[in-house]
Amino acid sequence: MHSSTSQEIDLLLEKAKSSGKTEDLAALWKAALELPQWHFITRQTANIEDRKPFVGVLDNKPWIFVFTDRQRAQEYARTITGGGFVDESGNVLVMSTDTPKAIDYLLALTSQGVYGVRFNELNGWFSPLQNLPAILQHVQRG
């Protein structure tokens, strides 16, 4: 099975942004869904068990931040000054989760009041979580 690369995702993102076409956005989602893992940033905590994927508030709405590769996750975490994402030795903690598990996690967050998902924040795309089931259906049908 073909696995998407960061570069492909960037190209698909540019295309979807410039064309605004549904099928270009669907291609982008498809590429993201085909990745073996999705990556989350998490704050440093005393107990590893307490670490949870970062949910940030933008426009007064809680969003879950997801990254298509570890490097992007680290880059974004470093932009948040005093966010607690970078440890004393300068490492960012990234949680990598198998994509099907990550999707289940995102779907479960809807009931916890999380509004949406933001992929590759800095240069990415986003969607309300309530649209996720329809996106999954649409992409998996295609």
Which residues make up each language-model segment?
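An interfacial alpha-helical scaffold signature
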Residues: M1-G142
